[in-house]
Amino acid sequence: MLHIADKTFASHLFTGTGKFASSQLMVEAIRACGSQLVTLAMKRVDLRQHNDAILEPLIAAGVTLLPNTSGAKTAEEAIFAAHLAREALGTNWLKLEIHPDARWLLPDPIETLKAAETLVQQGFIVLPYCGADPVLCKRLEEVGCAAVMPLGAPIGSNQGLETRAMLEIIIQQATVPVVVDAGIGVPSHAAQALEMGADAVLVNTAIAVADDPVNMAKAFRLAVEAGLLARQSGPGSRSHFAHATSPLTGFLEASA
């Protein structure tokens, strides 16, 4: 089980809502992957209408909604969006995203830390999307973030765990859950993240743009389960040298 703030999740796979061909396909994929925490961009929903094409099926599915501030370029914009989300959806949970450059969508570390500290003080449960910077992740933890969400690679790039070395440090030193977010392109990437110690992964593009999103969602569910089970099973240590599994020395000597 995964514990974040005041909630417990059986699934270690979180999903997004962008890029799906239809709301129906989105919900089917979410159900197939078993995700219990789903992000949605505030700029994509009509907060005045709970029968919004994206919002209504998510509410009906019974998942925990994690509104995000995607599109915000400054701490002030993110804080404003956070308050709109809390008022409209009745949740203190927030995925904090601040990326000023639309080409690379890389998170702004200075604005993210600034916004996170303010939002925590205002009663939000903040899960910040951030670069794979161990120092920044520790600072975000220290100001009260409920989890940290370092990137594996740029959003939507499907490149996998390009920041693996830094992710390992973040995981080793964290005392809050670590959710690898962005860049995960295939199920094996998700399995690797769980194997190395991440508490969860957030996947959107890789599922939504697949030829068969529902089956891809199932594949990610199985990969996350496999990665977690592998870690819990205690994998053997790596070695630079070979270690025979079936020594033949005694047999050969006896036959000589």
From Swiss-Prot:
Active-site residue list: K95 (schiff-base intermediate with dxp)
GO cellular component, one term: cytoplasm
Pathway involvement of the protein, from the record: Cofactor biosynthesis; thiamine diphosphate biosynthesis
Main location: cytoplasm
Catalytically driven reaction(s): [ThiS sulfur-carrier protein]-C-terminal-Gly-aminoethanethioate + 2-iminoacetate + 1-deoxy-D-xylulose 5-phosphate = [ThiS sulfur-carrier protein]-C-terminal Gly-Gly + 2-[(2R,5Z)-2-carboxy-4-methylthiazol-5(2H)-ylidene]ethyl phosphate + 2 H2O + H(+)
One Pfam family hit: ThiG
SUPFAM superfamilies documented for this protein: ThiG-like
Annotated compartments: Cytoplasm
InterPro entries tied to this protein: Aldolase_TIM, Thiazole_synthase_ThiG, ThiG
Enzyme class per UniProt: transferase
Residues reported to bind 1-deoxy-D-xylulose 5-phosphate: G156, A182, G183, N204, T205
Protein EC: 2.8.1.10
Gene3D superfamilies: Aldolase class I (3.20.20.70)
Gene Ontology molecular functions: thiazole synthase activity
ATP-binding is among the record's keywords: no
GO biological process per UniProt: thiamine diphosphate biosynthetic process
Alphabetic keyword roster: Cytoplasm, Schiff base, Thiamine biosynthesis, Transferase
Superkingdom in the source lineage: Bacteria
Record's function text: Catalyzes the rearrangement of 1-deoxy-D-xylulose 5-phosphate (DXP) to produce the thiazole phosphate moiety of thiamine. Sulfur is provided by the thiocarboxylate moiety of the carrier protein ThiS. In vitro, sulfur can be provided by H(2)S.
Family: Belongs to the ThiG family.
Subunit structure: Homotetramer. Forms heterodimers with either ThiH or ThiS.
Name of this protein: Thiazole synthase
